Regions:
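Conserved donor sugar-nucleotide recognition element shared by glycan-biosynthetic enzymes
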Residues: 64-72, 123, 142
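Short beta-strand immediately N-terminal to the catalytic nucleophile in serine-hydrolase-like folds
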Residues: 68, 86-88, 113
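Conserved acidic catalytic loop of the alpha/beta-hydrolase fold
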Residues: 66-84
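Conserved HGGG/HGGXW glycine-rich cap/lid loop of the alpha/beta-hydrolase fold
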Residues: 7-61, 75
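Flexible "cap/lid" loop of the alpha/beta hydrolase fold
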Residues: 97-102, 106-138
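Gly/Ala-rich beta-loop-alpha elbow adjacent to hydrolase catalytic centers
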Residues: 88-92, 96
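Residue in the alpha/beta-hydrolase core beta-strand immediately N-terminal to the catalytic nucleophile
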Residues: 49, 85, 108-111
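Conserved alpha/beta-hydrolase catalytic His-Asp/Glu region
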Residues: 121-126, 139-186
Length: 186
């Protein structure tokens, strides 16, 4: 596996075959797709940490869906990928739908997990609240956000029986830089 840093964006490139590009959700990282890697063993898998997320360096300037789309196009150009299968989760599904409109020739197929066209109004309100908490309280705010998301996103049974899943989600969210997380929420 090769790890690249293109314009402050961390990109993992592994395997050979048709390109499959994975785009994580809010608070996620390229590691979100680790469980899929055995099934994709015959593919070239590109896993990107979106600007301001996970191992990507702090994003300068605005963070937006349009910026994420531009980033994906730039990464594909740098890696000589003319067409790819795309896999997205949550926020990543919004990004990929926009990519399909902006650069349809780049998209061989889409696999969308937890797809959204845009967050509904109640979710937008919750995202603004998360942004304010992350920005004003920093790491303590991220801890509180993480605990709330763990309780909302994982069942009590999962939280009890699968501590590794809980640890993975907690680690993914707690590794986000609070200001960049806030800007992504907005």
């Amino acid at each position: 596996m090769a790890l690249h840093l293109f314009e402050r964006v961390a990109v993992e490139d592994e395997g050979e075959g048709e390109a499959v590009v994975c785009v994580h959700g809010l608070g996620g990282s390229s590691n979100s797709f680790t469980p899929l890697m055995p099934a994709l063993a015959r593919q070239r898998v590109i896993r990107i940490d979106l600007p301001g997320s996970a191992r990507s360096q702090r994003a300068e300037g605005p963070i937006s869906i349009a910026r994420f789309v531009d980033t994906l196009q730039s990464v594909c150009a740098r890696l000589n990928i003319a067409r790819a299968h795309w896999v997205g989760h949550s926020l990543g599904t919004i990004v990929l739908q926009n990519l399909a409109v902006a650069a349809p020739k780049l998209v061989r197929s889409l696999a969308l997990f937890g797809p959204l066209i845009t967050p509904p109004d109640p979710a937008r309100t919750a995202l603004r609240s998360r942004a304010a908490k992350a920005r004003s309280e920093g790491l303590a705010g991220m801890h509180e956000i993480t605990q709330a998301l763990l309780n909302a996103a994982l069942s009590a049974d999962t939280r009890q029986r699968q501590p590794l899943a809980v640890a993975f989600v907690r680690e993914s969210l707690m590794r986000q830089e609070p200001e960049c997380y806030a800007r992504t929420c907005e």
